[in-house]
Amino acid sequence: MAAHKVNFITGNANKLREVKAILEPEIEVTSKSIDLEEVQGTLEEVTESKCRRAAELVKGPVLVEDTALCYTALGGLPGAYIKWFLTTIGHQGLNNLLAAYTDKSAEAVCTFGYCAGPGEKVILFQGRCPGKIVPARGPNNFGWDPVFEYEGQTFAEMDKVEKNKISHRSRALAKLQAWFKEQQ
């Protein structure tokens, strides 16, 4: 039996699978798909706002996530707005953003917010993974994974178990797991 339970607020089946693969069985993860307004701001501000609102709606413990893809040459853009960039310009467009630059380095950043319930403090857990932007390689079934390369392989080319050991998401969730252990 899991010592802790959280409602992961997501409509993204791939994210849910990754989170469950990393957290369970120590932390039981259930899922609710709630369309939460995303404020404009830093990744931390966006995550905190979504987490507060989700806790109010669920009236219980929630976990929310926001991801950024930060290009060094563009001063951190597209950042927290990567979802909208990808939807609008696709993988080729994400590459084209760096056409005028020799620096293709980027950082994948994942921020999870946990809130025990309405009115409770939001606690943030952030993970980062360095890499670079490359022409799309691998299956096109999870966001920008085909264009983000870490140590010679794009996230899309990696075995899921391997990706879950090194990704920005796994690094953030490791911090969440450590925090939950401290609370026991």
Swiss-Prot record:
Query: Source species, please?
Result: Fusarium vanettenii (strain ATCC MYA-4622 / CBS 123669 / FGSC 9596 / NRRL 45880 / 77-13-4) (Fusarium solani subsp. pisi)
Which keywords annotate this record? Answer: Cytoplasm, Hydrolase, Magnesium, Manganese, Metal-binding, Nucleotide metabolism, Nucleotide-binding, Nucleus
The answer to whether keyword Manganese applies is: yes
What Enzyme Commission number does this protein have? 3.6.1.66
**Any matching Pfam family:** Ham1p_like
Family, according to the entry, reads as follows: Belongs to the HAM1 NTPase family.
Its annotated function is as follows: Pyrophosphatase that hydrolyzes non-canonical purine nucleotides such as inosine triphosphate (ITP), deoxyinosine triphosphate (dITP) or xanthosine 5'-triphosphate (XTP) to their respective monophosphate derivatives. The enzyme does not distinguish between the deoxy- and ribose forms. Probably excludes non-canonical purines from RNA and DNA precursor pools, thus preventing their incorporation into RNA and DNA and avoiding chromosomal lesions.
Q: Please give the name of this protein.
A: Inosine triphosphate pyrophosphatase
Which reaction is recorded as catalysed by this protein? Answer: ITP + H2O = IMP + diphosphate + H(+); dITP + H2O = dIMP + diphosphate + H(+); XTP + H2O = XMP + diphosphate + H(+)
- Please tell me where ITP binds in this chain: 10-15, 50, 66-67, 83, 142-145, 163, 168-169
List localization entries. Cytoplasm; Nucleus
- Subunit structure of this entry? Homodimer.
Q: Which GO-annotated molecular functions does the record name?
A: dITP diphosphatase activity; ITP diphosphatase activity; metal ion binding; nucleotide binding; XTP diphosphatase activity
Where does it mainly reside?
Answer: cytoplasm
